[in-house]
Amino acid sequence: MSNHPIPHKLKTFGPSKKLNDTGFLHIEGDQKIYPPFFDLNAIEQLRENWETQANDIFICTHQKVGTHLTKQFVSEILRAVYSYPENNPMASGDIGHATIPWPEVMVSQHGYAHFQDFLVKTADSPRVWYLHCENDDLPMKKIHPESKFIYVYRNPKGAAVSQYFFYKSHPLLEVNPAIEMDEFV
């Protein structure tokens, strides 16, 4: 269990291991490394079953390159153009996981039935997802040819500084909060 001063609320799936002496707790599967709050079975469910729709918009980023800012921009543009019904999470203007989900986390933390409910609630209007993976690792069975992808890039130096502060403060990664930038990089 983590000795980090800030607790986390995510379910974790093991066995987790540290990538090195300074932390970076992750799990391994399919010869890849995943965050410990991913359930590898959930990823497999998505890859076997999820077929995207024409109205799906994907924000594809590496962590700490502007994901939340991009989610905010896209949400505001869509809400200005479309009238979302009240039961659609996008109607709220919120950009959290319940509105603009990270599919692997949604299924890992809440189950595939919750994911399917989200698909039904949002089927008739543009819906937004965000992903932190490479194209070869997209968690879907089939991509609709009209689905849209927004790729966000950032200067690697700025991303490294942002990652440094994020990793130090994220309890689930078990990085020593006292780690220095030179050691981190």
Predicted regions and their residues:
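PAPS-dependent sulfotransferase catalytic domain
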Residues: 1-185
